[in-house]
Amino acid sequence: MKNKIKYVYSDLDGTIVSWNPKNQFTHQGKTYKNLHEVSHATVTAFKQLQAQGIKIGIVTGRDYCRVRWLEKYLNTDLPTITLDGAIIYFRDEIIRQEVLDKEFIHGINQIVKRYPTAAFKLNMGWGNYYTCNPSLIFEGDHAYREHFNADSKFYRKEIDNTVDWDINNMKVNQVYFDTFTCPEPMIQELDNLVEKSDVTAKSYRHSLYIIKKGVSKASALQNLQRDFLVEMKPANTIVFGDGDNDIEMMQWADHSVSLTGSDPECYKLAKYHTDSVDDDGIAKWINKNLLC
């Protein structure tokens, strides 16, 4: 296997970035977890892979404003896959994006008009449109955007959820709700809309996000292989991941690594296994199997 691998795509959170980082950063007087923290062991392992000619890329569910600094810190070689495959960036340009249907966005618009206190955002390429409603999740977005990306194209706008939107001039890649702010009847309406629409929704403890149906980390890798990285194949690519949104790419690649503490199905599907992110699992696996 060692001599077969030419490409590495790694998830971030729970894979090479701990949910419990040692460091914090301060923005406008408030302190936030530094979810850009990658261990020295992992950074060193990636650099050693690159020195051997193996290319490194990031594949994540994060918004690019929470990835761009890390992409540059790790000096990645490959396009960066964000929003679980909905947008792919390379050298500060969008090279591919998947857009939600206008009919679906119209449906979202009609629902949020009935619940004016709900906090949500519309991800649209370099721009994110937020309600003015308080949200700890989106407060973190603003901190990462402004603290780490002062030199970028990112912009933030406010969207009024009490009026009809100009949907014809909107290209929305992802809709993201802070479900702490959404009443139960609203969640039910969103579930009903999702069920009859061409979309995929994922719900976690504090959030609900929606992207176009059929879009995943695996579909993004397949599109890159077809249109941009023709030499990248399942046989010469290894993926690292821990979550349920990593399952499809585990099935796509011939080589895959999951960590202790991962989503059970993801862990089961992975070809190889390693210690947890807090125990430098990925760095240990690379050193033992690719740098030996």
UniProtKB/Swiss-Prot annotation:
Record keyword Metal-binding present: yes
PROSITE patterns to which the protein is assigned, alphabetical: COF_1 (PS01228), COF_2 (PS01229)
Needed co-factor(s): Mg(2+)
EC number: 3.1.3.-
Residues the entry annotates as binding phosphate: 12, 60-61, 217, 245
Record's GO cellular component terms: cytosol
GO molecular function: magnesium ion binding; phosphatase activity
Record bears the keyword Mitochondrion: no
Enzyme class: hydrolase
Pfam family, one: Hydrolase_3
Organism domain of life: Bacteria
Binding site for Mg(2+): 11, 13, 242
Keywords of the record: Hydrolase, Magnesium, Metal-binding
Active site, renumbered: 11 (nucleophile)
Family: Belongs to the HAD-like hydrolase superfamily. Cof family.
Protein name, per record: Putative phosphatase MPN_381
